[in-house]
């Protein structure tokens, strides 16, 4: 009965996000440390960022130093369907290995880790200064593409994207 009541208390409690939404390069370190007595620093945030993974647009996390990744079912069900056969339905029956050699690879899926964030707001905003309409859009698109190309420097191992925040109030180049 005690476990049931404890569980009910967890369900009934409210989650508060007093610090709001934040990105890895804009986390309110001092505010959180002061309020909660934590000792978060940039090195800790970098480790958390390096554990965060993006798979085909889904969020995921490394859960081992061996590269094991945990994500949501809907993010990998397509892979399970592709790997299934009439004899082995991985969606219905699941799959577990005894060792790494027996693991299955999801064809066409790539795990991306965010390795760098650069604020490019000034550069993006300057590219459209004094322009309107199609000319404005073309200039912004050209500048965004140039930033992405420069950041990845032609290295096919990386995926660089300029991300817009706050309805165009801030831009960051994310390198995965």
Cite the ranges covered by each PLM segment.
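N-terminal export leaders
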Residues: 1-3
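Terminal presequence/propeptide segments associated with secretion/organelle targeting
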Residues: 7-176
């Amino acid at each position: 009965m005690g476990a049931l009541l404890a569980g009910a208390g967890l369900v009934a409690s409210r989650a508060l996000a007093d610090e709001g939404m934040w990105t890895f390069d804009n986390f309110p370190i001092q505010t959180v440390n002061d309020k909660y007595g934590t000792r978060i620093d940039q090195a800790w945030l970098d480790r958390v960022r390096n554990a965060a993974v993006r798979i085909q647009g889904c969020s995921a996390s490394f859960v081992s130093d061996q590269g094991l990744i945990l994500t949501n079912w809907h993010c990998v069900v397509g892979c399970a369907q592709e790997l299934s056969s009439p004899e082995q339905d991985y969606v219905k029956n699941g799959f577990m290995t005894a060792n790494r050699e027996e693991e299955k690879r999801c064809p066409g899926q790539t795990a991306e880790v965010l390795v760098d964030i650069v604020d490019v707001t000034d550069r993006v905003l300057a590219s459209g200064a004094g322009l309107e309409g199609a000319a404005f859009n073309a200039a912004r698109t050209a500048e965004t593409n140039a930033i992405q190309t420069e950041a990845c420097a032609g290295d096919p191992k990386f995926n660089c994207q300029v991300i817009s925040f706050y309805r165009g109030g801030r831009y960051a180049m994310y390198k995965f």
